[in-house]
């Protein structure tokens, strides 16, 4: 089998903004606008308040802003809280190849880490688009067999997308990006039994936070498997994949 981890790690490390045509950029901006609207509308939802309060209590560093409260917390904390807020009303964008909501994890990671790093809007847009591309393709490979086994692609595939987002913004090289994907393969989680509870929107925040964590650890030298997605007992083979690559 082709190394999926290396394939997407290489793509994420090397893609440029001009890799995407104008139509793709237009729809990316519409998805960003959509997410901002639904996140703002949900900032007083109970799940938004609870998660935002938790990250505020844990806060020891002011890196990125929480939508629900306006407080500045760590970028991981902001990604967690804002991801949950953006998915709280469940009106965020949907991709049916992905079988989930790709923006709800990729964009909170991009905005939080981008704020911490002082990234340009062009860099944030590129990171977001690259992350959505990877999470959607991984979600498409996993397909409905993964979803029908009880997994929530917004959380699982979304974790890989947010890892690409964070890797781009942190300027990780190809090997570091591959390593980050390998690491997040053991973090990506989220089960459909949480649907109908606060656990479902929390999945989006988990995925956003997972990506920042994996990329930052990889940048510091943390070592994981370079085939963590597709290896024996890796992510694909333990998460309902039907062994088909579309």
Where are these regions (language model features)?
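N-terminal core-entry segment
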Residues: 1-246
């Amino acid at each position: 089998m082709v190394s999926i981890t290396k394939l997407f790690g290489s793509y994420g490390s090397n893609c440029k903004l001009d890799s995407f045509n104008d139509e793709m950029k237009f729809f990316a901006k519409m998805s960003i606008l959509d997410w901002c609207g639904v996140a703002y509308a949900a900032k007083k939802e109970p799940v938004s308040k609870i998660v935002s309060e938790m990250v505020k209590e844990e806060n020891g560093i002011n890196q990125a802003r929480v939508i629900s409260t306006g407080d500045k917390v760590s970028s991981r904390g902001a990604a967690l809280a804002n991801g949950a807020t953006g998915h709280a009303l469940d009106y965020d964008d949907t991709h049916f190849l992905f079988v989930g909501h790709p923006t709800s994890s990729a964009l909170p990671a991009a905005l939080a880490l981008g704020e911490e790093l002082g990234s340009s809007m062009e860099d944030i847009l590129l990171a977001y688009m690259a992350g959505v591309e990877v999470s959607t393709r991984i979600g498409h490979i996993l397909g409905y067999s993964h979803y029908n086994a009880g997994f929530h692609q917004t959380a699982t595939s979304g974790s890989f997308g947010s890892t690409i987002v964070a890797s781009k913004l942190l300027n990780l090289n190809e090997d570091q990006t591959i390593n980050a994907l390998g690491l997040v393969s053991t973090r990506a989680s989220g089960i459909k039994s949480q649907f109908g509870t606060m656990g479902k929107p929390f999945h989006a925040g988990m995925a956003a936070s997972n990506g920042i964590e994996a990329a930052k650890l990889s940048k510091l030298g943390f070592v994981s498997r370079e085939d963590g997605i597709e290896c024996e007992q890796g992510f694909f083979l333990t998460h309902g994949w039907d062994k088909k690559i579309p």
